[in-house]
C-alpha cells in the first residue's frame, strides 16, 4: 500500500475471490483516511444491491455509506472538489470507461482505492478489473479459504442448486438464486457443456 502526498494522486486496487475480505479492507482504508481527517467519497455500482443500496457492506457486516451510480461517468459528476480519497467498490460491474474515470481522478492528485473481483466464476479475468490493475500503483491480491480443502482460495465457485455452474452460464446473474463459495485452483469446478 502506498501513501503519497496530497498533491500526488495514485491508484490502489484490492482484488481476490468472494469471501477474501475485499470490502472489509476497503472499509478499513476508508476509515483510516477519515481518522487522518481526509475527505472521502465512496462509490458503488447500482447493480450491487445485495445488502444495501447506499452502503458498502462486507460479508462480516461492516459497512460505510456510499453513493450508488449506474455508470462510471457519474462518479466524475458527483466528485466534490475538496475530496482527497475516492473509494470504488465492486469495480468488476462497471464498464471499461471506469479506467479513464479512475485515471482522471488520480491525475487530479487524489488517492483512488478500488476493490473488486479479479476473476469471474469461470476463473477468467473479470470485466474492467484487469485494466484497472494495470494502471494502479499498488495491487493487493487477497485470498479466502477453500471450503473444500482449507487451502488458500483464489477463485469464486458459483453453485446453482448445489452444483457447479456451467462455463456457458451468464457471467452476471442479477436476482438469481445462486450461491458462491471460495475455492482453490484444484477444487474449483467449471463444467463445459
UniProtKB/Swiss-Prot annotation:
GO terms for biological process: DNA biosynthetic process; thymidine metabolic process. GO terms for cellular component: cytosol. Pfam families: TK. Its EC number is 2.7.1.21. SUPFAM superfamilies: Glucocorticoid receptor-like (DNA-binding domain), P-loop containing nucleoside triphosphate hydrolases. The active site is at 90 (proton acceptor). Its main location: cytoplasm. GO terms for molecular function: ATP binding; thymidine kinase activity; zinc ion binding. It catalyses: thymidine + ATP = dTMP + ADP + H(+). It comes from the Bacteria. ATP binds at residues 16-23, 89-92. Zn(2+) binds at residues 146, 149, 184, 187. Keywords: ATP-binding, Cytoplasm, DNA synthesis, Kinase, Metal-binding, Nucleotide-binding, Transferase, Zinc. It is found in: Cytoplasm. Signal peptide: none annotated. It is an enzyme of class 2 (transferase). PANTHER family: THYMIDINE KINASE, THYMIDINE KINASE, CYTOSOLIC. NCBIfam families: PRK04296.1-1. Belongs to the thymidine kinase family. Homotetramer. This is Thymidine kinase. The lineage of its organism: Bacteria, Bacillati, Bacillota, Clostridia, Thermoanaerobacterales. The gene is tdk.
